[in-house]
């Protein structure tokens, strides 16, 4: 018989309920409140206050609640459906479908969203490059298969577009399964993404959406839902990993997860720490990130968008994410302002596997030479601004010309942005990327004006565009 209690107090989304002292719900248990207008409100127990009293955070709106209503302990944490039936569906934090499709019956397995990370013995640490088809990422900051990568950037520099392109590329080129967690972002963007994925076809019978699970806890949701929606998506991804699959987990935006934790922490009356963040910031981030890992059976490769408040990378939220990552992609406003998309800063982006033993000697050499040319150009910018290009040596003039071409060549037309730009998207394999930049560094493009390098795929596309203009 499930334990029953009554609501004592409601403050915003925090509910205080009293249960019999010998039947107090455990921490993280889901408790349900049957609503008078029909339906139920699920809350998660966060604190036990003694004398049978618990504090819980609501996963939905508390409109219409009042003191004295009955509360039922479910006896376990929030549990969400997992398995092949979840592919091509859209869920909320509780694992309820929100796409208008049929609900899931008892035949579908459900797993609790709170679980321990895999043990040390189970974890796998092989270093292998994961091809994305985006030139600047594959060359300068290659993703690790089964690793964690974050895309950092301020407001409006293109984080979500890069993530959308990655989902489309991976579904088409590698036919992998993806799980997308929309954490505290705009509902409109989520809606756009669903429609784009339904239209993007892998073959005649399959769309990108059919191979993707989507979980949303958007800006309009209470902080409890935004805090837990990442765990819901991760639980669904873990199922496929444990079945021996290689799965992709996209989280947009991990900063909103921190923000929701801060709101919940304040509502529960905890003392804030630096810059007003929750004192448990590191612990909460660790609980999520440590579960995103690869085992000997399968892998989870994760890509996370990280909003950087006021473009300040020393803010505790982005700084906490840094320590968990294998690769960092930094999007820069100054590059976006020049209409170079993706607006990746190659000198600020890093990857643990940019190592000749992993990516190969040629890839490593080309990447380092590209960085050297760009860094030299950056150093010369002050001299150019004061004295002009004429005062540079011939060698430096050539370096500047090549650096400008490299910057423009890092731009790339995206499939998901085709409706805005009118340019068909280009997927460039790693091999082609390395070869293209090697040819540029060797001087094969020195006679081509820099404008021909803008928004092209590989080096052959640049040559074709230039030759077409000469006819």
UniProtKB/Swiss-Prot annotation:
Gene Ontology terms: cellular component: plasma membrane; proton-transporting ATP synthase complex
CDD domains registered for this protein in UniProt: ATP-synt_F1_beta_C, ATP-synt_F1_beta_N, F1-ATPase_beta_CD
UniProt: ATP binding residues: 153-160
Pfam (any one): ATP-synt_ab_N
Gene3D superfamilies in UniProt: 2.40.10.170, Bovine Mitochondrial F1-atpase, Atp Synthase Beta Chain, Chain D, domain 3, P-loop containing nucleotide triphosphate hydrolases
EC number: 7.1.2.2
Subunit structure: F-type ATPases have 2 components, CF(1) - the catalytic core - and CF(0) - the membrane proton channel. CF(1) has five subunits: alpha(3), beta(3), gamma(1), delta(1), epsilon(1). CF(0) has four main subunits: a(1), b(1), b'(1) and c(9-12).
Record protein name field: ATP synthase subunit beta
Organism: Chloroflexus aggregans (strain MD-66 / DSM 9485)
Gene: atpD
């Amino acid at each position: 018989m499930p334990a029953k209690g009554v609501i004592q107090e409601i403050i915003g989304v925090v509910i205080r309920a009293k249960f019999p002292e010998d039947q107090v719900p455990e921490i993280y248990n889901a408790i349900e409140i049957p609503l008078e207008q029909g339906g139920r409100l699920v809350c998660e127990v966060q604190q036990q206050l003694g004398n049978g009293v618990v504090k819980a955070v609501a996963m939905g709106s508390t409109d219409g609640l009042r003191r004295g209503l009955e509360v039922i302990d479910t006896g376990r944490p929030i549990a969400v459906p997992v398995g092949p039936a979840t592919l091509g569906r859209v869920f909320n934090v509780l694992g309820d479908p929100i796409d208008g499709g049929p609900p899931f019956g008892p035949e579908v397995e459900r797993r609790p969203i709170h679980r321990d990370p895999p043990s040390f013995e189970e974890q796998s640490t092989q270093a292998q490059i994961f091809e994305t088809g985006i030139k600047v990422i594959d060359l300068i900051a290659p993703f690790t298969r089964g690793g964690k990568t974050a895309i950092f950037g301020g407001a409006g520099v293109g984080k979500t577009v890069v993530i959308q392109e990655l989902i489309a590329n991976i579904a088409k080129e590698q036919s992998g399964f993806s799980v997308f967690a929309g954490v505290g972002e705009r509902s409109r963007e989520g809606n756009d993404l669903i429609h784009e994925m339904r239209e993007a076809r892998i073959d005649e019978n399959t769309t990108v959406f059919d191979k993707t699970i989507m979980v949303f806890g958007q800006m309009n949701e209470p902080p409890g839902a935004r805090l837990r929606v990442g765990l819901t998506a991760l639980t669904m991804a873990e199922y496929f990993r444990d079945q021996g699959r290689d799965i992709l987990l996209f989280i947009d935006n991990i900063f909103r997860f921190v923000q929701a934790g801060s709101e919940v922490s304040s509502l529960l009356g905890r003392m804030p720490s630096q810059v007003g963040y929750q004192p448990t910031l590191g612990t909460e981030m660790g609980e999520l990130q440590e579960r995103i890992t690869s085992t000997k059976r399968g892998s989870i490769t994760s890509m996370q968008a990280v909003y950087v408040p006021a473009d300040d990378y020393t803010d505790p939220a982005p700084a906490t994410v840094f320590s968990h990552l294998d690769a960092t992609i930094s999007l820069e406003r100054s590059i976006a302002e020049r209409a170079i998309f993706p607006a990746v800063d190659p000198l600020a982006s890093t990857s643990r596997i940019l190592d000749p033993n992993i990516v190969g000697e040629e890839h490593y050499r080309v990447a380092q030479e590209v960085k050297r040319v760009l860094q030299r150009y950056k150093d010369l910018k002050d001299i150019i601004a004061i004295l002009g290009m004429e005062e540079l040596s011939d060698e430096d003039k050539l370096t500047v010309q090549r650096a400008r071409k490299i910057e423009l060549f890092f731009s790339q037309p995206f499939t998901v942005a085709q409706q805005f730009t009118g340019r068909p998207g280009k997927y460039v394999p790693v091999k082609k990327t390395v070869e293209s930049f090697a040819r540029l560094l060797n001087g094969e493009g020195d006679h081509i004006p820099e404008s021909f390098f803008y928004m092209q795929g590989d080096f052959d596309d640049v040559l074709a565009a230039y030759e077409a203009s000469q006819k």
